[in-house]
């Protein structure tokens, strides 16, 4: 099984999702990896810890099947960042001993990176109604537009923590953002 993706799009996605991947002392070892979920229409990359999770999606240039795997962020991201913009093919391979790895193929070479079993990753099930948590999904451009609209009113001095930053209010049908400098809201 293999898929092809634009190296620049994948690099940007990995950098954005990777901000939540713990680099050391992960309470669950699988969380120190990216979770890749590939279909013919989309490539989903998830990263996070036990309290927060981020998932990004890009479209593959081509894909010949579905696959799920865990992969360490450092070797993958460091290698992809060093490549010029080009198609990057990632093929799942299995050794005779049963070990799996991703074979990254590009115009000037290749790299093999071991991968783990995606079933070890903490499930991304919708939170139950009894635990009080909610799941929200939104377009990143909508979130950026909301933050950009309220950020001019944010109080710049960190000595008054209650006025510093942007406040998020999650309601059942929308997300409200608020900021104040004690003059404008």
Q: Predicted segments — roles?
A:
Residues 1-185:
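Structural preference for solvent-exposed beta-strand-turn elements
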């Amino acid at each position: 099984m293999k898929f092809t993706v634009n190296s620049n799009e994948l690099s940007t996605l990995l950098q954005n999702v990777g901000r939540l991947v713990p680099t050391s002392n992960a309470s669950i070892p699988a969380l120190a990896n990216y979770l890749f979920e590939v279909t013919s229409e989309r490539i989903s990359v998830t990263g996070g810890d036990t309290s927060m999770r981020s998932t990004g999606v890009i479209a593959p240039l081509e894909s010949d099947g579905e696959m799920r795997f865990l992969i360490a962020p450092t070797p993958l991201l460091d290698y992809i960042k060093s490549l010029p913009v080009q198609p990057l093919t990632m093929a799942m391979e299995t050794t005779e001993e049963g070990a799996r790895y991703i074979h990254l193929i590009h115009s000037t070479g290749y790299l093999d990176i071991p991968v783990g079993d995606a079933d070890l990753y903490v499930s991304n099930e919708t939170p139950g109604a009894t635990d009080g948590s909610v799941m929200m999904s939104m377009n990143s451009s909508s979130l950026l537009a909301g933050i950009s609209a309220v950020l001019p009113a944010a109080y710049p001095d960190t000595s008054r923590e209650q006025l510093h930053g942007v406040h998020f209010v999650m309601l059942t049908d929308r997300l409200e953002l608020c900021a104040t400098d004690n003059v404008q809201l």
